[in-house]
């Protein structure tokens, strides 16, 4: 009887070791990356940053520029310097005005004290999922639109 109990314990330990080995081999093969929900979260973060910059421009009665950097995949607030950093597996593109207020515009979305903006669209994508963050040039309003490619 005593020998049988020890043998059962040895079987359980062996099975657990095999399961752990299989998990170590299989788990890295499961694709990890930005989910649809997290991609939408990034879109919401960027929209909130843009809305904050618009509000700051109205509040301080001075233009505020939100800076987009495609190389580092960042969106930086012109009001408080906060940054939304996108991971490398997220596609990041923007459609921006070439001229605004009679002057050339770089990689920024400018907001004016009147609430107006130069407008633009920021596009986030991963595989067949995408979101557009659109800034209306006339009202400065910000909206998020699903842009799935399925």
Regions found by a protein language model. Give the residues of each.
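N-terminal helix-rich module
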Residues: 2-3, 13, 21, 25-59, ...
């Amino acid at each position: 009887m005593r020998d049988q109990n020890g043998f059962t314990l040895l079987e359980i330990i062996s099975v657990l070791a095999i399961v752990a080995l299989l998990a170590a081999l299989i788990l890295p093969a499961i694709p990890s990356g930005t989910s649809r929900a997290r991609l939408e979260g990034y879109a919401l973060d960027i929209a909130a940053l843009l809305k904050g910059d618009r509000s700051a421009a109205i509040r301080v009665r001075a233009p505020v520029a939100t800076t987009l950097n495609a190389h580092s995949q960042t969106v930086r607030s012109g009001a408080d310097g906060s940054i939304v950093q996108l991971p490398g597996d997220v596609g990041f593109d923007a459609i921006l005005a070439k001229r605004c207020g009679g002057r050339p515009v770089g990689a920024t979305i400018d907001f004016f004290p009147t609430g107006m903006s130069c407008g633009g669209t920021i596009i986030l994508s991963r595989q067949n999922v995408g979101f557009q963050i659109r800034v209306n040039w006339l009202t400065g309003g910000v909206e998020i639109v699903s842009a799935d490619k399925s």
